[in-house]
Regions:
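Small-residue-biased structural context
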Residues: 1-135
Length: 135
């Protein structure tokens, strides 16, 4: 399996995460409760799979390899900036989950950042798929 195929396989798992995130923020906006343990699992998957595994594969291996194609350097830079944006959204989710655990009713910002994250994932995944076709 090529590196591109491996990253596309990751994207199939990311689609599953998108669906869970959408379900959670929809339920939160509807005033329903989501167990904090479930929210912690989402945060863990974002940290451990998306950031530590998927982004690492791209940033440490794939992008440096295809950066030799000069015409892709600008797109790689844009994708790296988006990875950092993703990390910042994830930090906000974690920050508000911590406050929620401490007893504050911060479901609205959690829902808002989850929605932002899901929109980001859909858009970013599409950009990466198009990038893989060019690489």
């Amino acid at each position: 399996m090529s590196a591109t195929d491996e990253l596309r396989k990751d994207h199939k798992q990311i689609v599953r995460l998108e669906k869970v995130i959408i379900k959670c923020y929809t339920e939160l906006y509807a005033g329903k409760n989501i167990p904090l343990s479930d929210m912690d699992k989402i945060s863990l998957v974002i940290d451990e799979f998306l950031d530590s595994i998927h982004y690492s594969r791209e940033e440490d291996s794939y992008f440096p390899c295809v950066a030799s194609y000069d015409h892709l350097k600008q797109e790689i830079r844009a994708l790296l900036i988006e990875h950092e944006f993703s990390r910042r959204i994830a930090l906000q989710i974690k920050k508000y989950l911590k406050r929620w655990k401490e007893g504050e009713d911060v479901r609205e910002p959690v829902a808002r950042y989850l929605k932002t994250y899901s929109i980001f994932l859909i858009d970013h995944k599409t950009k990466e798929e198009n990038f893989f076709d060019k690489a």
